[in-house]
Every structure is written in structure tokens, then in C-alpha cells.
Amino acid sequence: MRRFFQVVLFLCLQSIGVAAEQLCAPLSYEDSSYSVCRIDLRETRLELFNLDGQGAPLGSLGALAESLRAEGKELGFAMNAGMFDEALKPIGLYVEDGNESKKLNRRDGYGNFHVKPNGVFYVKGDRVGVAATEAYVKLNEKPDFATQSGPMLVIDGKIHPKFSETGMSYKIRNGVGMLDAHTAIFVISENAVNFYDFAKLFRDRLTCANALFFDGTVSSL
């Protein structure tokens, strides 16, 4: 599976009054190190990007930054935020600027995406949300931006039931949690961690009732 990119843009940096370096900070928790980025949508614009201006897959954070510079936009923060198939198409829900290019995927299958419950991260105006897929269906949202990934890390304050404290799969991981209706928190581990420890960070240290896994070995920030 390939990755696509989720981006925070400063469309009017001076009037927003938030410097790019203020978005993210290091955090240590239970012998692991993380980079944590808090994004308040009342102050910062959050968007999803897949293709460049010519309709070609971006493929890298460098290509993304270059594409945005060509449009006169400044990149404040970027993180890969989902999974693609070999044809570079998202395997789950993908909405960009209100246009749904891929419908919600509720099928069973193999791989992290299909470890249910998986979930959806979405943006609507200055609101942000993280919800398990079946819960998202009931919300009947019409988001501006959305990406489906999996598995969920934390569901309504509980760590995903399939995670084990003694899990032996250790990788660099990244994901997103919801702090409140306007604030998302994005995290990437600086060292390899298992799913349980990553989920515990969101639940216990960052106090996120819902959090979603984005990517493993190829995580980038």
C-alpha cells in the first residue's frame, strides 16, 4: 500500500499569528519519544492532498511542499495520512475539498486497514472528528476533507480490543486523535513502538477519547 499526505497550510500566516515551529513539540512517555502536533482549526487551515496541480501523485513531502510553493502557499506541517492500493488509489473513504473520490470501505480483508474497528478522520469547517467507521456512518457527515484508515487506536476511551500489551510488532507509527471539536493532535513516534503503547499514549497522556492509526514503517512528518 502507498501513502498520501495530510497537510496543514498557513494561508495567511501573519493574521493567524501562529508560527510553524509552534505547531509541534517533542514528548517523552514511558521510555518512548514522540513528535506531537496540536492543530486548532479556528487558527489553522487543515487540508488533504493526493495529487499535484497536474493531476500526478505527489509521492513525497518534498514534492508536496514544492507544489504548494508554486501556488503561493506555505506549508506548516505535513504527515502521511492513509493507505493506497498499487494503482495509487485510496482503499478507503477519501474526500478532498468536499469531493468524494472514494466511498467508505466497510469490507473485510487483510492488513492493518481491515483490523476492525477501523475509522475516519474528517474536517468540516473549523470542526474536526475521529470516529470508528460504523459510528461515522451514523453521523451522516458531509465533510470538507476525510480519510479512512485503520485500525482505530482508541474508541470511546478504550484501547482497541485486538491490541496486546505484549505485542511484538514494533514500528515507527503515526496517527491522529481528537482533543475537542476544534482541535486535532497528530503524533509520530521517534522510535519503534507497538500498537498498544501507541494507543495508550493517546488515551492516557494526550487524553483523546478517539484516535486513529495512519501508518507504520513508512510514517513521515
Protein language model regions, located:
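Short, intrinsically disordered/low-complexity patches at protein termini
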Residues: R3, Q14, A209-N210
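Sec-dependent signal peptide recognition
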Residues: R2-F10
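Zymogen propeptides
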Residues: G17-N112
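Hydrophobic h-region of N-terminal signal peptides that target proteins for export
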Residues: F10-V18
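Generic hydrophobic, helix-prone segments enriched in Leu/Val/Ile
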Residues: R3, L61-A65, F121, V128
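Active-site beta-strand/loop microenvironment that shapes enzyme catalytic pockets
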Residues: E74, L104-L221
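A broad, structure-centric signal for solvent-exposed, well-ordered loop/edge residues
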Residues: V8, E86, S101, H160-P161
